[in-house]
Amino acid sequence: MKKVLFFFFFLTAWSLYSEAQVANEDKHRLIVTTDLGGTDPDDIQSMIHLLLCSNVIDIEGLISSQVWMDDPDKTAKISEVVEQFGEVLPRLNKHAEGYPSLNQLRAIIKRGQPSSNMTGVGQGKDSPGSELIISVVDKKKDQRSVWLAAWGGMNTIAQALWKVKHTRCLLYTSDAADDL
């Protein structure tokens, strides 16, 4: 009888573990660039909505970006919304699993390009946000795609792409062997 009970306990534990693994693999990886902190209230509303859904999405970056003009660093505005989310996080955790901790969210808030438009892209214009994008995409242990949501300016994403294009492996051949 003990063997039968152990067997059923083992099967139950294994199925629960398997479901948890599948659920985690089904979560999409997301990095958001946002110009939150301007005069548009929908940016704050969108960030709140995203955080409320963060138990079903792996948020891997919250990046302050510039849109039309060079603005001061607005990561403090993102931090403000995250801290307010932290106040309700214990109640959310009572009703659903999978929410990131407040410390996890704090760690992924980064500043994007300080200059607006394509003036913020090129040699020597890396930012903590563009570096975060590259490091998240380069994670070897996680092969899921990374979704980039541009809620504001896209030049931080452009800088990450620029750097990868200009610093990764390049091929130069000194002769035209093998029909290259």
Predicted regions and their residues:
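Boundary at the C-terminal end of the N-terminal hydrophobic targeting segment
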Residues: 18-20
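Second-shell loop/turn segments in exported
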Residues: 32-37, 119-120, 145-146
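Histidine-anchored nucleotide/phosphate-binding helix
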Residues: 45-53, 161
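Glycine-rich nucleotide/cofactor/substrate-binding loop typically near the N-terminus or early
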Residues: 26, 51-140
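Single conserved hydrophobic/aromatic residue that forms the stacking wall/gate
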Residues: 172-180
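Structural recognition of the beta-strand scaffold that forms the well-ordered cores
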Residues: 29-33, 60-64, 147-150
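Sec-dependent N-terminal signal peptides
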Residues: 4-12
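Internal, conserved structured core segments that host functional sites
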Residues: 123-167
